């Protein structure tokens, strides 16, 4: 089997908050008549530049044409050579490698007539406990709207949430107090996510303030600036709660292991460059005796299905994970969206080959956008994933 062509389709899909996220749907064609699909998820992140899709397609074709899709390690090395790792969270090269690698996995599994999770080594479970995100309070008046989100999602079966914190601690504290008062033990807040906004000392003070409202807290996420390994270590010594950090390069993961800076690796294929790299990162965590949580950039169903296959194949996921992306959008580009039930993400049925997801060409056309340009998006809209222009 040889790769014969590549398609890249940019789509822009609004979240329920009004913020439009742009993604790229990947199709890889072969001489066997099989097509693999993937997703370069959520290009709507800083830094404030966009990728030219025509140039990207030509560059990727120069790597992929004529290749055997099963040569995953060879292709991934060539992808990394051309789209290198950096020490930055939202490196767009990782998004690109992720979309291609996921499509290759879909293609290979389809050829073998098995599911992607079987191609990854089989399943240890069929579902993953996940949480719904509560986005960061900038103003106290946002507390009530976020409480409405909890009410709505609890009715839909989501009983675990993660809270983005650090911009307005008074509002964060008010929200937690009211959640505890209204919902009691019916709701858990699994993590406080600082998103690298504060230095570790300020994060430590915030943690002491917010953990008065421990509602099943499992971890503290990203409580220091990016790549501040010493800060993470210092904070880890001073809090009783496990510290979690995203993995965005193997060098960065190596440094966190060397410094013993964290307890839990937050691993997401989009940030580390695909299923192949995510699996490596999970194995490195296991060797280092660290737990893993499955992260997210709020993918659509194609990207989330890939994550579900990965999560159900790993043995060291012992905490509530994050992939609830499809629930945040007003639409999708597939005929069969991923399944959520009672707060769990279910992997597609293993009797369905590949990722188990089928594109809907009419929806792909409906949400198609000409490019990945930014329009008039502000920094705070990017950070807080809102269409609200108030700052």
Curated annotation (Swiss-Prot):
Reactions catalysed: galactarate = (2S,3R)-dihydroxy-5-oxohexanedioate + H2O
Sites where the protein binds substrate: 15, 89, 296, 385
Note: The enzyme product is the enantiomer of the product obtained in the galactarate dehydratase reaction catalyzed by STM3697; the enzymes thus differ in their regiochemistry of dehydration.
GO MF terms held by the record: lyase activity; metal ion binding
Enzyme active site: 90, 164
Site feature (Increases basicity of active site Tyr) residues: 162
Effect of residue 45 to Q: Loss of activity
PANTHER family: D-GALACTONATE DEHYDRATASE-RELATED, ENOLASE SUPERFAMILY MEMBER DDB_G0284701
Pfam families: MR_MLE_C, MR_MLE_N
InterPro entries given in the database record: DgoD-like, Enolase-like_C_sf, Enolase-like_N, Enolase_C-like, Galactarate_dehydratase_2, Mandelate_racemase_C, Mandelate_racemase_N_dom
Keywords from the named record: Lyase, Magnesium, Metal-binding
Cofactor note: Binds 2 magnesium ions per subunit.
This protein's name: Galactarate dehydratase (D-threo-forming)
């Amino acid at each position: 089997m040889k790769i014969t062509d590549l398609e890249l389709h940019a789509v822009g899909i609004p979240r329920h908050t009004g913020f439009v996220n742009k993604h790229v749907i990947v199709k890889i064609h072969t001489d066997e008549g099989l097509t693999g699909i993937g997703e370069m998820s959520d290009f709507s992140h800083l830094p404030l530049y966009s990728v030219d899709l025509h140039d990207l397609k030509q560059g990727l074709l120069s790597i992929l044409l004529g290749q055997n899709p099963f040569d995953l390690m060879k292709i991934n090395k060539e992808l990394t050579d051309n789209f290198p790792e950096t020490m930055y969270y939202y490196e767009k090269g990782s998004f690109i490698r992720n979309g291609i690698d996921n499509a290759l996995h879909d293609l290979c599994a389809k050829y073998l007539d098995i599911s992607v999770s079987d191609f990854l080594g089989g399943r240890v479970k069929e579902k993953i406990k996940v949480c719904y995100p509560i986005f960061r309070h900038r103003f106290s008046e946002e507390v009530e709207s976020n409480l409405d989100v909890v009410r709505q999602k609890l009715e839909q079966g989501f009983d675990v949430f993660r809270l983005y914190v650090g911009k307005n601690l008074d509002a964060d504290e008010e929200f937690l107090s009211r959640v505890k008062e209204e919902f009691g033990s019916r709701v858990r807040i699994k993590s406080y996510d600082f998103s690298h906004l504060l230095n570790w000392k300020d994060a430590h003070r915030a943690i002491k303030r917010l953990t008065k409202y421990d509602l099943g807290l499992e971890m503290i996420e990203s409580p220091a600036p990016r790549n501040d390994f010493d800060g993470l270590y210092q904070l880890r010594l001073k809090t009783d709660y496990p510290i979690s950090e995203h993995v965005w390069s193997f060098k960065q993961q190596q440094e966190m292991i060397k410094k013993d800076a964290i307890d839990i690796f937050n691993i997401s294929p989009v940030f580390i460059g695909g299923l192949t790299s995510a699996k490596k990162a999970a194995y490195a965590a296991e060797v280092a005796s660290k737990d893993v949580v499955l992260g997210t950039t709020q993918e659509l169903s194609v990207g989330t299905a890939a994550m579900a296959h990965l999560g159900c194949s790993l043995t060291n996921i012992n905490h509530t994970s994050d992939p609830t992306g499809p629930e945040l959008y007003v639409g999708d580009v597939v005929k069969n969206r991923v399944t959520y039930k009672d707060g769990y993400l279910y992997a597609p049925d293993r009797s369905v080959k590949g990722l188990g997801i089928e594109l809907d060409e009419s929806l792909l056309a409906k949400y198609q956008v000409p490019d990945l340009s930014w329009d008039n998006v502000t920094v705070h809209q990017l950070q807080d994933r809102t269409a609200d222009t108030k700052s």
